[in-house]
């Protein structure tokens, strides 16, 4: 899972 915009 990712909570950043640059995944």
Swiss-Prot record:
GO terms for molecular function: toxin activity. Disulfide bonds join 2-7. The modification Pyrrolidone carboxylic acid is found at residue 1. Its main location: secreted. The keyword Secreted applies. Keywords: Amidation, Bromination, Disulfide bond, Pyrrolidone carboxylic acid, Secreted, Toxin. Transmembrane segments: none annotated. The modification Cysteine amide is found at residue 7. Expressed by the venom duct. The modification 6'-bromotryptophan is found at residue 6. It is found in: Secreted. GO terms for cellular component: extracellular region. The cysteine framework is C-C. Does not elicit gross behavioral symptoms when injected centrally or peripherally in mice. This is Bromoheptapeptide Im.
């Amino acid at each position: 899972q990712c909570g950043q915009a640059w995944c």
